[in-house]
Regions:
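Basic, flexible linker segments flanking DNA-binding modules
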Residues: 3-8, 31, 40-142, 296-302
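An active-site-proximal beta-strand-loop segment
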Residues: 136-176, 182-184
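Helical coiled-coil/dimerization "stalks"
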Residues: 1-34
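C-terminal domain-tail junction helix/linker
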Residues: 221, 228-232, 256-305
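Mobile genetic element proteins and their domesticated derivatives, centered on retroelements
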Residues: 30-31, 41, 65, 81, ...
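RNase H-like polynucleotidyl transferase catalytic core
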Residues: 111-115, 209-214, 228-246, 263-265
Length: 305
């Protein structure tokens, strides 16, 4: 299946290659290879801070929208939210902006549609939770069978916020895929899933389970559709129970304790720090629970057994 990248995704890939391999002198070549203009790449690079600020502003407004959405049990659309904002919070926000943010972050109201012919399509659009199939049986001694995922926030550069999405192998502790973003829109989990697919070379364990919390990313119908397409079974923690995904929480805890990410002055610097830590963690972090091996070594050990 051929993957078509948008110009923005191509620019992001070029920037990643240049940063990862320190190849500053081949911008023109990479742009030509990707079929994009050199001037377009530099314009995209220059606008990065503007995009980050716009995403941060969106997130502030979205958190307010989300609080109302949850308060009303996910049964309100853009117009009711606009009226609640004005009357209860004294905040004036255009209904088109509210609708845009709801669409951007995947909020879909559970409201009854007057048209009976749309009932079936509506049902497919509602967020759905999944049972806790895993039941804390994280280590099943089979690489790729238990896949744990979650998102955490990272504050850097005087209060700017980024979000780190990861997938961890429950048997080997290896971080199989990760994606860092300045926004919480659905793209963060789509990108993570795509990187997981690439890391696994699209060859998943026949009984693979993807375990997460009940966050709106993981209950979103489009995300669930993508997981199902990979023939992976979804499992979710019980509401408000962080112990149901303890190994993933543990990794984030170690990262925050060991990395001076708050000292980063830019998103690019933070991204480099995250990439470097995960590379070191997977390949050079010896763990007592893995028979004193690294996650990558332990994966090889289990596969050879």
């Amino acid at each position: 299946e051929k993957t078509i990248l948008t110009p923005s995704e191509k620019f992001e890939l070029i920037e990643y290659i240049i940063r990862q391999h320190q190849l500053k002198n081949i911008v023109s070549y990479l742009c030509e290879l990707a079929g994009v203009s050199r001037s377009g790449y530099y314009a995209w690079l220059k606008a990065a801070s503007i995009r980050q600020q716009k995403d941060l502003d969106d997130e502030v407004d979205f958190e307010l929208i989300l609080s109302i959405f949850k308060q009303k049990k996910e049964k309100v659309g853009a117009l009711p939210i606009k009226m609640i904002l004005e009357n209860d919070y004294y905040v004036v926000m255009n209904h088109k902006k509210i609708r845009r943010l709801m669409r951007k972050y995947g909020l879909i109201a559970k409201v009854r549609n007057a048209n009976p012919y749309k009932k079936m399509s509506k049902a497919t659009q509602e967020h759905k939770t999944c049972p806790n199939i895993l039941k804390r049986e994280f280590n099943q001694e089979e690489p790729g069978k238990v896949l744990l995922t979650d998102i955490t926030y990272l504050y850097y550069a005087n209060g700017q916020k980024a979000y780190l999405s990861c997938v961890k192998d429950g048997s080997t502790n290896e971080i199989l895929a990760h994606y860092l973003s300045t926004s919480l829109k659905m793209n963060i989990v789509y990108k993570t899933l795509k990187r997981l697919k690439e890391a696994m070379q699209n060859q998943f364990h026949p009984e693979a389970i993807l375990h997460s919390d009940q966050g709106f990313h993981y209950t979103h119908p489009l995300f669930q559709k993508r997981v199902k397409k990979l023939k992976i079974t979804q499992s979710m923690s019980r509401k408000g129970n962080c112990w149901d995904n303890a190994p993933m929480e543990s990794f984030f805890g170690h990262f925050k304790d060991e990395v001076d990410y708050k000292e980063c002055n830019s998103f690019i610097e933070l991204k480099q720090m995250v990439d470097s830590y995960i590379e070191e963690y997977n390949n050079h972090r010896y763990q007592w629970g893995l028979k004193k091996m690294t996650p990558v070594q332990y994966r090889g050990h289990l596969l050879a057994a």
